[in-house]
């Protein structure tokens, strides 16, 4: 069909309207100025420059001393307060050490050097705050995208506008072209393209139709969508992103904990060394001023400021970057564990495959007792509350065939075994071949030999039929598996509860040579533990309830975004985009973060060692010591902030190909 100019304009109008309604972030300059430490650091810098100009132009000494002292107050009051609070808690931190060094510089008449120290120290602190703020704001800004109101469709078909926060699971809402989606849900009717870059990082709108999942805060395109709310507003993907970032910021990495453990001892040792540098030369008749100058220089250059900033900013930046691209990482500890991955263990259904299996065959054991239609009806009734992809496929096929699905009660899913429920007065079970304990069934052999997945339907404990289901490999599976193999010490291993034939069929197509099939959940745990006992750091990737125990046992675990709730809670990370190629990418990003941490620690240690040796065995000028020490701190902070950029994500994705 050819669109007229009017039709083209109408089709594009919603996206134009959305661009005006979505809140734009502050400009870079305004965002910087909103950080308190940036404002004080700027004031300190201006006062320092004013004092320097006055000093160089021969102004009265009282003038430039006053300006430098004002610089002390503007740039140093925050650090002085933090240091005092630490001292009250019987701790010694770098803030107090820097203030002590600056005061010492004033005491020996080196107010210029002390003011320079204050300015650079305040600047490095502001950079750290900017990194932390940007890490949080890059993700928390998503909350601003969630609309305040929603249009609920009531039982009589009328519409009512309510607050989005009042929506409950099961509510039906309508989203018109250009509107933002008010809650996580599923499409009941309608079709449209949804711009979900704010959640998944996808650059192009994604086609949505009946049954597809949508996220709160994403933007509807040119069609009208009728949705059912599937998550409470407090549990939407957007809300979980914010919660996970907050948790990640509060959870310190192992490297950071080690640094903090030795920081107190190091600081006390440094103070003792500074006192020794003062007392010992004076005992041998040295002049006070040069002794104090050397000691103050030592205190400045030996302070572990850059070491303290070396670890957490890069890790938190990596977490924020991953979150912007649809991967939620729950803590800095997880980033370190992902970087250590030496083997990836993959589930099959819903992870390596699309997770949208299709019911291929319905085989009643005795058509005179239960025909194919009744068999599928009972199976769908038992599975209608299931979260497993196989269960959803059975229900979907029954609906496609127009079969009325009766209500069921007392539903229970047994991981790795199947489900059972009471359908009317009938006790219906859907069992896997591995958990089935009845007489051998001839109907299983052709299904299993073809690589299909079989499900046995039992009525009151007696087998009445066999269902055959097939699944499709994810489009990016082959490339992703190859990338994982290239990144890790060992190629990926496939862990599945499915039969060996089905597992090997999928594995061969994906390029996997190590397959462990027909595993119950506890057997998956055993395989993971055996791999780790052999020296591997296992990353488990899965989506089903039966993957949760193995995820808990693995070194790290990532859940595919369409997975069951228990799996999402157990995993260390979640891929919202539900795309397998994000797994090698997040491993690559974690390794980038680890390299940045290593480089930062090397930079910090090198600067400290060189400057300390120069001061002890040479004549290190105090201004040069200040610039060298604080310059390394600024350099470390800026290096960590590199991981916030899209370029870092693209580099990780390229390395994973």
UniProtKB/Swiss-Prot annotation:
Enzyme active site: 347 (4-aspartylphosphate intermediate)
EC number, UniProt record: 7.2.2.-
Subcellular localization, as worded in the UniProt entry: Cell membrane
GO molecular function terms noted in the UniProt entry: ABC-type nickel transporter activity; ATP binding; ATP hydrolysis activity; metal ion binding; P-type cobalt transporter activity
Short name of one Pfam family: Hydrolase
Keywords per UniProt: ATP-binding, Cell membrane, Cobalt, Magnesium, Membrane, Metal-binding, Nickel, Nucleotide-binding, Phosphoprotein, Translocase, Transmembrane, Transmembrane helix
Main location: membrane
Membrane-topology annotation of the record: Multi-pass membrane protein
Transmembrane spans: 40-60, 62-82, 101-121, 268-288, 299-319, 596-618
One of the record's GO cellular component terms: plasma membrane
InterPro entries xref list: ATPase_P-typ_cyto_dom_N, ATPase_P-typ_P_site, ATPase_P-typ_TM_dom_sf, ATPase_P-typ_transduc_dom_A_sf, Cation_Transport_ATPase, HAD-like_sf, HAD_sf, P-typ_ATPase_IB
CDD domains xref list: P-type_ATPase_HM_ZosA_PfeT-like
Catalytic activity entry: Ni(2+)(out) + ATP + H2O = Ni(2+)(in) + ADP + phosphate + H(+); Co(2+)(out) + ATP + H2O = Co(2+)(in) + ADP + phosphate + H(+)
Binding annotation for Mg(2+): 543, 547
Coiled-coil regions listed: none
Cross-referenced PANTHER family: CADMIUM_ZINC-TRANSPORTING ATPASE HMA1, CHLOROPLASTIC-RELATED, PROBABLE CADMIUM/ZINC-TRANSPORTING ATPASE HMA1
Similarity remark: Belongs to the cation transport ATPase (P-type) (TC 3.A.3) family. Type IB subfamily.
Function per UniProt: Involved in heavy metal homeostasis. Probably exports nickel and cobalt ions out of the cell.
Protein name, UniProt field: Probable cobalt/nickel-exporting P-type ATPase
């Amino acid at each position: 069909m050819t669109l007229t100019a009017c039709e083209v304009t109408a089709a594009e109008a919603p996206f134009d309207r959305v661009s005006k309604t979505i809140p734009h972030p502050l400009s870079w300059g305004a965002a910087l100025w909103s950080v308190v430490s940036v404002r004080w650091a700027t004031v300190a810098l201006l006062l320092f420059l004013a004092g320097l100009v006055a000093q160089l132009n021969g102004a009265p000494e009282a003038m430039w001393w006053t300006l430098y002292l004002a610089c002390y107050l503007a740039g140093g009051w925050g650090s002085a307060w933090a240091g005092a609070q630490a001292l009250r808690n019987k701790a010694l931190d770098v803030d107090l050490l820097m203030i002590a060094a600056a005061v010492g510089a004033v005491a020996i008449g080196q107010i210029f050097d002390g003011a320079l120290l204050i300015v650079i120290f305040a600047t490095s602190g502001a950079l750290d705050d900017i990194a932390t703020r940007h890490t949080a704001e890059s993700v928390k800004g998503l909350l601003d995208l969630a609309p305040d109101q929603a249009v609920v469709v009531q039982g009589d078909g009328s519409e009512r506008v309510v607050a989005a926060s009042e929506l409950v699971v099961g509510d039906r809402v309508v989203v018109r072209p250009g509107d933002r989606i008010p809650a996580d849900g599923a499409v009941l009717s309608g079709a449209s393209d949804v711009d979900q870059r704010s959640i998944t990082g996808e650059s192009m709108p994604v086609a949505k139709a009946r049954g597809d999942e949508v996220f709160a805060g994403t933007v509807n395109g040119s069609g009208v969508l009728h949705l059912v709310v599937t998550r409470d507003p407090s549990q939407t993907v957007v809300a979980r992103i914010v919660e996970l970032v907050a948790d990640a910021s509060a959870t310190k990495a192992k490297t950071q904990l080690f640094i903090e453990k030795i920081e107190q001892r190091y600081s006390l040792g440094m103070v003792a060394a500074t006192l020794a540098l003062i007392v010992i030369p004076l005992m041998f008749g040295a002049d006070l001023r040069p002794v104090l100058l050397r000691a103050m220089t030592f205190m400045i250059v030996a302070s572990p400021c850059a070491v303290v900033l070396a670890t957490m900013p890069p890790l938190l930046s990596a977490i924020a970057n991953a979150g912007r691209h649809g991967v939620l990482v729950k803590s800095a500890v997880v980033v370190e564990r992902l970087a250590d991955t030496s083997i990836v263990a993959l589930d099959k259904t819903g992870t390596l495959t699309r997770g949208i299996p299709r019911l291929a065959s319905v085989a009643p054991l005795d058509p005179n007792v239960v025909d194919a239609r009744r068999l599928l009806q009972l199976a769908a009734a038992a599975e209608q509350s299931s979260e497993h992809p196989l269960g959803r496929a059975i229900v979907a096929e029954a609906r496609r065939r127009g079969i009325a699905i009766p209500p069921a009660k007392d539903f229970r899913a047994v991981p790795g075994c199947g489900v059972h429920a009471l359908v009317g007065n009938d006790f219906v079970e859907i069992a896997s071949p591995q958990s089935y304990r009845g007489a051998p069934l001839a109907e299983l052999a052709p299904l299993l030999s073809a690589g299909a997945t079989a499900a046995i339907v039992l009525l009151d404990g007696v087998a009445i039929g066999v269902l055959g289901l097939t699944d499709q490999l994810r489009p990016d599976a082959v490339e992703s598996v190859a990338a994982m193999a290239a990144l890790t010490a060992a190629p990926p291993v496939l862990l599945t509860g499915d039969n060996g034939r089905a597992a090997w069929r999928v594995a061969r197509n994906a390029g996997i040579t190590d397959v462990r099939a027909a595993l119950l959940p506890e057997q998956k745990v055993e395989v993971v533990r055996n791999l780790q006992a052999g020296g591997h750091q296992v990353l488990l990737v899965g989506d089903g309830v039966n993957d949760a125990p193995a995820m808990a046992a693995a070194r790290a675990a990532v859940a595919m975004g369409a997975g069951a709730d228990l799996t999402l809670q157990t995993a260390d990370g979640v891929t919202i985009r539900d795309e397998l190629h994000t797994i090698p990418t997040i491993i690559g990003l974690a390794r980038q973060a680890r390299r940045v941490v290593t480089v930062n620690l090397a930079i910090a240690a090198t600067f400290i060692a060189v400057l300390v040796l120069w001061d002890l065995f040479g004549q290190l000028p105090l201004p040069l010591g200040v610039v060298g020490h604080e310059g390394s701190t600024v350099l470390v902070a800026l290096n960590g902030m590199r991981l916030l950029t899209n370029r870092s994500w693209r580099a990780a994705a390229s390395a994973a190909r």
